[in-house]
């Protein structure tokens, strides 16, 4: 039976998160017998909780294609970690309520470890409530620390950016070191992982 899909962005934005959004929207159109519309959550999962859904079918093909080259998070992202099912069943039930209201049968959550955990929890609550929902976590993290994932989209971009920035900073230090500083400290992202450094 044909259902709608819900896509949301989570965590820090990378130069690949919008490309992933474009791919989800375009690929969904290749399955018209299974997926009707793709809704995007305004500001991530908060968009579902607040019922702020963007109907991507109203956007032009040209605009969706432009997402491949657009930085930032076009639909808005969030750092909102849903608590455990035991601690906050109300929020999970709210998600399912919104999904039912918009006939959503597919949930794509684009982010890191917390997003994958949320997709898993939503799949568990949907099963327990008897609601047929396919939940898919889409990896995206510059941290490159997702379990059983070799390389995350986002990591290659940041690795290149940090390498180039370090080279450029070294030229600055080199040109000033005779009469000025000889030390340069570069702090990079990566949370508890050190892949970027």
Predicted regions and their residues:
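Short, acidic/small-residue loops that bind anionic groups at enzyme active sites
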Residues: 37, 123-152, 159-164
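Glycine-rich oxoanion-binding loops at beta->alpha junctions
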Residues: 51-105, 114-115, 142, 154, ...
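Short Gly/Thr/Asp-enriched flexible loops that form oxyanion-binding sites at enzyme active sites
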Residues: 20-24, 113-133
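N-terminal phosphate-binding or glycine-rich loops at protein starts, especially the Walker A/P-loop
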Residues: 1-53
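Conserved anion/nucleotide-ligand pocket segment
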Residues: 177-197
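Solvent-exposed alpha-helices and their adjacent loops that cap or buttress functional pockets
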Residues: 1, 6, 30-33, 65-69, ...
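Short glycine-rich or small-residue beta-strand-to-loop segments that form or flank ligand, phosphate
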Residues: 4-14, 74-79, 105-111, 137, ...
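Short, ordered loop/turn segments at secondary-structure junctions
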Residues: 10-12, 41-46, 79-80, 112-113, ...
